[in-house]
């Protein structure tokens, strides 16, 4: 990047739309989850990663790497999930202070119920408004904005 990099009008417009649409989509999903009496979307992200990890679970630092949470946020969220019986913390045998986080049966059921609402929201808010080709193009373009880029 150059010292005096100034965004083009097109870059500013794209950025503004990306930020606004992202916020609107997340708010719509959050509203749908709340109407369904379900936990916030952030819970789904953690439960999903833990379910994908299987019985071995994940260490907190691995969850931070796989999600968008800062360390202090993930600690509070994990405490809440544990208090609600959705995850369990297990000691790491070769690390006296370390813990592995594993999803419980209740956590799997909560994730399943959340996905019913979340998946429907994705289908309506994104899949129902764009063609398959448009979705593929959007996925490709957004992948290029990632760091590092996702090229699939």
Where do the PLM segments sit?
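DNA-binding alpha-helical recognition surfaces that contact promoter or target DNA
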Residues: 48, 76, 140
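N-terminal positioning helix adjacent to the helix-turn-helix/winged-helix DNA-binding module
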Residues: 10, 14, 42-43, 106
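N-terminal leader segment of winged-helix/HTH proteins
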Residues: 1-36, 136
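C-terminal regulatory/oligomerization modules of transcriptional regulators
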Residues: 1-9, 132-152
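N-terminal helix-turn-helix DNA-binding core of bacterial DNA-binding proteins
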Residues: 27-73
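Alpha-helical linker/hinge and terminal dimerization helices associated
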Residues: 25, 29-32, 67, 110-129, ...
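Charged, amphipathic alpha-helical coiled-coil/dimerization segments
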Residues: 79-137
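Short, hydrophobic-biased segments on the C-terminal half of alpha helices
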Residues: 60, 78-79
């Amino acid at each position: 990047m150059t010292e005096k990099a100034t965004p083009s009008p097109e870059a500013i417009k794209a950025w503004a739309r990306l930020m606004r649409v992202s916020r609107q989509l997340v708010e719509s999903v959050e509203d749908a989850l709340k109407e369904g009496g379900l936990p916030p979307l952030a819970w789904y992200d953690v439960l999903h990663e833990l379910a994908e990890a299987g019985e071995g679970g994940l260490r907190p630092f691995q969850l931070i790497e796989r999600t968008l949470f800062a360390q202090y946020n993930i600690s509070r969220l994990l405490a809440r999930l544990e208090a609600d019986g959705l995850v369990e913390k297990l000691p790491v045998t070769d690390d006296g202070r370390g813990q592995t986080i594993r999803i419980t049966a209740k956590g799997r059921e909560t994730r399943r119920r959340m996905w019913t609402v979340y998946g429907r929201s994705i289908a309506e808010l994104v899949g129902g408004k764009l063609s398959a080709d448009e979705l593929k193009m959007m996925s490709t373009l957004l992948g290029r904005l990632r760091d590092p880029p996702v090229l699939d």
